[in-house]
């Protein structure tokens, strides 16, 4: 097996959308029912994707809103971003658009690995954002999209596998696009 690769992933989104629950479900395989607002946590996990082992460092950020100032650390050595909203919250869906814009401004790249996640899909009766709305937003960003339920452990692993694939796809395109110069 090839040597493991290290990847750092930031999880961003409005408060109470389930960023920590999704991350803990992936890392520890459990759902945390209580809610304590996150300041910032970092988790690590080994995962194998397509035969390649990855050592993931997951930065579970504090909830952002439209007025939040992004710390510069969210742009340094980050290989991919998971942007999370709740399918039960119009506000979180609107704020994720603002977060995406700020992220692009901060990182300064046209193409960055982004995974848009509509969380809390198990709350059918409270849903206000359709699957189609989430998918359309992700497509407008040229980003991957999944809906998830951290509580029911639906697609938590898929979310993190997918962001790795997105990061590798963009890394591969960037390395192929590099030009070389020869002096003779």
Swiss-Prot record:
Its EC number is 3.6.5.-. This is GTP-binding protein Rheb. A motif (Effector region) lies at residues 35-43. One of its GO terms (biological process) is negative regulation of cold-induced thermogenesis. The lineage of its organism: Eukaryota, Metazoa, Chordata, Craniata, Vertebrata. It comes from Rattus norvegicus (Rat). Its main location: membrane. The record marks 35 as: Important for autoinhibition of GTPase activity. Mg(2+) binds at residues 20, 38. The modification Phosphoserine is found at residue 130. Disulfide bonds: none annotated. The gene is Rheb.
């Amino acid at each position: 097996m090839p040597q493991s690769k290290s990847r750092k992933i930031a999880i961003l989104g409005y408060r109470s959308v389930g960023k920590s629950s999704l991350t803990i479900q992936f890392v520890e395989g459990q759902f945390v029912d209580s809610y304590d607002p996150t300041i910032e946590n970092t988790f690590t996990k080994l995962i194998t994707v397509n035969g390649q082992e990855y050592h993931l460092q997951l930065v579970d950020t504090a909830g952002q809103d439209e007025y939040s100032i992004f710390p510069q650390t969210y742009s340094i050595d980050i290989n991919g971003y998971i942007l999370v909203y709740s399918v039960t919250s119009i506000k979180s869906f609107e704020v994720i658009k603002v977060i995406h814009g700020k992220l692009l401004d901060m990182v300064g790249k046209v193409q960055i690995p982004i995974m848009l996640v509509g969380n809390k899909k198990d709350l059918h009766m409270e849903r206000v954002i359709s699957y189609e709305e989430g998918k359309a937003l992700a497509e407008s960003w040229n980003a991957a999209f999944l809906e998830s339920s951290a509580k029911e452990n639906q697609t938590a692993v898929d979310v993190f596998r997918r962001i790795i694939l997105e990061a590798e796809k963009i890394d591969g395109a960037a390395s192929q696009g590099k030009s070389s110069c020869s002096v003779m």
